[in-house]
Each structure stands twice: as structure tokens, then as C-alpha cells.
Amino acid sequence: VSMEPYPTPNMVEQNLHEILEEVSFTDRIIFGRTNYSKVANAYEGHRHFYNECATEVISFCQEHGIDYHIKEKTITEE
């Protein structure tokens, strides 16, 4: 399951954990940020937001034995 581009809350308000539970049947999750979007980059704390989301995806996948790939530049220095 590809979860990219994943929007920031100023684009769409959604619950990442609920989405992960819905796709827990899969054997692989690909997660990535919304790139090249002025709207996503305008979200205050977008780097922190994506770092937190990536951490949640990694933890969920490890707990459920799901392979995962976090796209390049999703995890960044804050």
C-alpha cells in the first residue's frame, strides 16, 4: 500500500493510526511526504509532523510484521 503523498493537516484532517489499521492486511507500506507543495510547506511544523508520522508508520509496521519503506526526504532535521 502506498501512502504518498501524505497530506499535512492544513490540507486534509485525518487520523494516521486509523488508516494504518485499515491497511494492516498488506505486506508492505510505502510512506512519503507531500513534496513540491506550497500548502504542505506552509504548515507550521511540517518537518516535525512528517517525522512523527514516519515514526508512527515504522512502529506500526514493526509491531504488525509489515515491511515498510519511508520515502527519501520524509524524515528530516527539525
Question: Model-derived features: where do they sit?
Answer:
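Auxiliary Fe-S-binding modules of radical SAM enzymes
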Residues: 11-78
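Short acidic loop-to-helix transition motifs that present clustered carboxylates
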Residues: 8
